[in-house]
A protein has these predicted regions:
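Short secondary-structure junctions
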Residues: 78-86, 142
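Helix-start/capping segments and mature chain N-termini
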Residues: 1-76, 93-165
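Hydrophobic/aromatic-rich structural module bridging two neighboring secondary-structure elements via a short loop
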Residues: 84-96
Length: 165
């Protein structure tokens, strides 16, 4: 599937580095942000962090300095001298903050959407219960196709793309 340029995990309490865990399947929340340019800029960064912190509170993952800690880890792991066009994923559970960086795949013009009958657990949150979605995505060329989750004859969302109507 994706080739990661960075994969690191940190203890949530102390921010000490620990063995990498992607946290998929855990009780937790993630966000994926587009990072681009030199110096690096993150599209809609404030919105991503605000939604992440709100969702973490709803999941009972509470730390007063969480926003500051996430920013510290992002700055620690990004180079000021590198030109970016990547996706930065930040995932958290009650014990671990996991960050990863992968190249952003540019979609082809002839893009297909494979419909899959599936409704995510608690779809109002970007939770880490994505195992079924990832199993579908791992068998596809993500530059040419994505999955559309359908339930009750309605398209709910996609695996990785944005839907615009």
């Amino acid at each position: 599937m994706a080739t990661y340029l960075l994969k690191k995990s940190y203890q949530l309490k102390s921010l000490k580095e620990t063995a990498f865990k992607d946290l998929w399947g855990d009780h937790g929340i993630f966000t994926t942000m587009w990072i681009f340019g030199k110096p690096a800029k993150i599209l809609f960064f404030d919105n991503h962090i605000k939604n992440l912190v709100k969702s973490l509170k709803d999941y009972g993952i509470i730390k007063r300095s969480i926003k500051k800690d996430i920013l510290k880890l992002i700055n620690k792991n990004l180079s000021k001298n590198k030109k970016y066009n990547h996706l930065l994923r930040v995932a958290l559970n009650k014990k671990i903050v996991s960050i990863s960086l992968r190249k952003r795949i540019r979609p082809k013009l002839n893009f297909n959407l494979k419909l899959v009958k599936l409704k995510r657990e608690k779809p109002q949150y970007k939770n880490l219960k994505y195992k079924k979605i990832l199993s579908h995505l791992s068998r596809m060329d993500n530059s040419k196709a994505d999955i559309g989750l359908i339930y009750d004859k309605k398209i709910l969302e996609t695996g990785t793309s944005n839907l615009l109507f």
